[in-house]
Amino acid sequence: MSDAKQVFSPAQRSLLTGVINRIIPPKDDMPGAGSLGIAAFIEDAAASTTSWTRLFNEGLAQIAVAAGQGSDHGFENLSNTAKDELLRSIEVANPVFFDQLILQTYNGYYTKPEVFELIGYEVPKPAPPGAYPELLDVSLLDQQRNRKPFWKKV
């Protein structure tokens, strides 16, 4: 992330990291979204337009206020159950923000080569110059269709 695209304060980045670690928490050998630097991916997305910058700043402020940020409390000091309840309340109160937060978290997470490797996908090799792409072999999706969900239902 370049300095020109910084739209979150250090406190907001820390809060965002904690929040996205609840959206995609670490499980077994899969890392949580916060530990992969997805907050920077989300900040880049938020910086793309002024309306998104406002949406994410207001949404993070809502989470901070609801968690008692600025006091001895705060999001990170809540139990996981309390964090999840707080995020559910934000989802109801500000669905546009929450939908974008989820979307950008998943976009950032599932485009990381480390995640591709851990879930068993091979990153395709680049085609040589001038080559035409082959049509999708839908049987390649069988592996995904047949596996158990590895995401957290909320």
Which role does the model predict for each range below?
Residues 14, 18, 22, 30, ...:
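Mature-region segments of soluble proteins
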Residues 2-10:
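N-terminal module-boundary/linker segments of secreted carbohydrate-active enzymes
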